[in-house]
Amino acid sequence: YQSKPLSPMWRKVNSWGQFLQFITILPFATIASLTDLAGPIITSKEFGSITEGFKQLAATIKNRQEAAQFARDIGIVTNETVANAWVTEAEQDYMDPKVRKMSDAYFRVIGLNFFTNFTREFAAGMGVQFITKHARNEFNNPRSERYLRELGLTREDVLTWIQNGRRMTTPEGQKVKQGLQRFVESSILRPNAAERPVWASDPHWALVWQLKQYFYSYQKVILGGVKREALTRLMESPNTPIRATVGIFALTAVATMPLAMLGLELREYAKNGLAWLLPGVESGPKYFRSDRMDWPEYVTEIYDRSGFHGAMAIPMMAGQAADFGKSPVFTLLGPTAETVDEAFSNGWRVDRTLKDRLLPIYNQL
């Protein structure tokens, strides 16, 4: 695709098509991203990190300026508009400049930029707690040395860094900085070309690939990290495989699923509130869908929203579309193709297409 640059016309089509899907599909993206807070807890690899996560979350909120400055100091947050789990910097670079500004503004308005930076600041704080805890190793954790080694650190590096006032300018400080960067990159989704198929980097396919990046990145970064840790523990304790691996799997579930539950609840309250606020729709019990679910259905819903299917979520969504009488092909071809398909299916019922697909917020209610 580098030998065949994107034509100006196709660039505009891609840009406006993507922007339309941003404003119609992602108004609740910040709420849906709450599960991102589980990443640093999972990467901390021990059940005690759940308690530490609550403490660090409170500390990040309370000392926001300090947390933000530390994140900038180690290079995981910049003052520029950030990419998020739903759209990468590379995808933004191929957008029409006017549409990109509008997209950036939209993500600021819905709070996604703020939340993306906040999760990175939280992850940086969790990283400091992680390396400090395992450098001191007060409870003689046999895995502590390995945990630090995986970040390119030793116990001596971290303790010397602490004794020197946690300055990043010392040789140990530079190693700690790189180690914390590795921790954050293993905790927070920051999609890039390495986390998607080769064809997905071609801007000609932007409308087909749109909104699929999250599932690939979650599988590679979070689920891949869990898998690697489980395999390592299996090699360390081959005679007790269940005991060796159950902890990391349980931690992943316990850290993620309550956040998915909270996200679903907040989404339903947000929809109900908007229905009360906006003309033409009424608030009511219909927006609290989870209240009508039985336990198996609710657990399945939360499992889906936790992201545990990874990239398999894409063909599964296509299968669900087929169950509802829609074409799974258009689901695989992306939300823009689904919009076109729905418009043709509705024909002259333009009002239905507007309400169900094209009117931001209303199409979610």
What are these regions (language model features)?
Residues 1-201, 234-240:
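Non-transmembrane, interaction-prone alpha-helical and coil segments associated with secretion
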Residues 30-70, 74, 78, 82-90, ...:
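Small-residue-rich, membrane-active alpha-helical segments
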